[in-house]
């Protein structure tokens, strides 16, 4: 399809248009819970979950040279019982159709090595809560663009509002290869924005899966929740 669009105003258990991997599930309240919590709602360590849209997305077309522009928006919350020990983060990603959850923890389920590799064919916008020095993370919670590597090509400081709902808008303008991500906390009226040039057609396969991936830390205390409340996406191949 040259155009794809979908809207989840809330999620439903056994949602046919979602592929859930790892620990991801939809709660009876209609929340996409990417990582495990115990019976008291406390997040658990060493949890990894992903959720992608059921249909592949046509991001570019080799026959015509057309590349898709897209816009996606979602609302999510990260809650950590102890803000001093939080890990590891959530990402929106585009990856090959056969992509499976990779290493958890700081790799966020998207990569399995600190070394970048073009065979990943993956682009992600990470909302990273833990400084993995081996990935050259900055020493604060941050938003980053990941292109075939967990080591971001560009980051911006993000002040995590613990337990507050964040509204994210990610857009890609294929005409100028501009990727933009913004995060707003309506409750505190704070906002963060990151933009860079990324040539998706040189990184991604023609057809991709789009969705979310999240992971908690391996150590007992390095935990947080990763809950997505709503998600919309629209893409269109354009010259």
From Swiss-Prot:
Binding residue positions for Ca(2+): 128, 132, 137
One annotated GO biological process: killing of cells of another organism
GO cellular component, one term: protein-containing complex
SUPFAM superfamilies: Concanavalin A-like lectins/glucanases
Classification via CDD domains: lectin_legume_LecRK_Arcelin_ConA
InterPro entries associated with the record: ConA-like_dom_sf, L-lectin, Lectin_LegA_CS, Lectin_legB_Mn/Ca_BS, Legume_lectin_dom, Leguminous_Lectin
Molecular function per GO: calcium ion binding; carbohydrate binding; manganese ion binding
Binding of Mn(2+), residues: 126, 128, 137, 142
Record's keyword terms, sorted: Antimicrobial, Calcium, Fungicide, Lectin, Manganese, Metal-binding
Transmembrane segments annotated in the record for this chain: none
A Pfam family matched in the record: Lectin_legB
Source species, domain of life: Eukaryota
Positions that bind D-glucose: 88, 106, 217-218
Function according to Swiss-Prot or TrEMBL: Galactose-binding lectin. Agglutinates human erythrocytes, and requires Ca(2+) and Mn(2+) ions for full agglutinating activity. Has antifungal activity against Fusarium sp., A.niger and A.flavus.
Subunit relationships: Tetramer consisting of heterodimers of alpha and beta chains.
Membership in a protein family: Belongs to the leguminous lectin family.
Protein name: Seed lectin beta chain
């Amino acid at each position: 399809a040259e155009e794809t669009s979908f809207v989840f105003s809330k999620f439903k258990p056994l949602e046919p248009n979602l592929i859930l991997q790892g620990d991801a599930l939809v709660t009876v309240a209609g929340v996409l819970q990417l990582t495990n919590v115990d019976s008291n709602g406390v997040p658990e360590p060493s949890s990894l979950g992903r959720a992608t849209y059921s249909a592949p997305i046509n991001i570019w077309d080799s026959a015509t040279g057309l590349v898709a522009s897209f816009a996606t928006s979602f609302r999510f919350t990260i809650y950590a019982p102890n803000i001093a020990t939080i890990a590891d983060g959530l990402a929106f990603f585009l990856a090959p159709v056969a992509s499976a959850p990779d290493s958890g923890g700081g790799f966020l389920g998207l990569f399995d090595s600190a070394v970048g590799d073009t065979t990943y064919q993956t682009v992600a916008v990470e909302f990273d809560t833990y400084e993995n020095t081996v990935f050259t993370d900055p020493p604060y919670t941050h938003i980053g663009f990941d292109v075939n590597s967990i080591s971001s090509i560009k980051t911006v400081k993000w002040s995590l509002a613990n337990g507050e709902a964040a509204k994210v808008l990610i857009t890609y303008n294929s005409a100028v290869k501009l990727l933009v991500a913004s995060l707003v906390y309506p409750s505190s009226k704070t906002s963060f924005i990151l933009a860079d040039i990324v040539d998706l057609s040189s990184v991604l396969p023609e057809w991709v899966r789009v969705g979310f991936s999240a992971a908690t830390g391996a150590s007992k205390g390095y935990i947080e929740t990763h809950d997505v409340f709503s998600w919309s996406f629209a893409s269109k191949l354009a010259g």
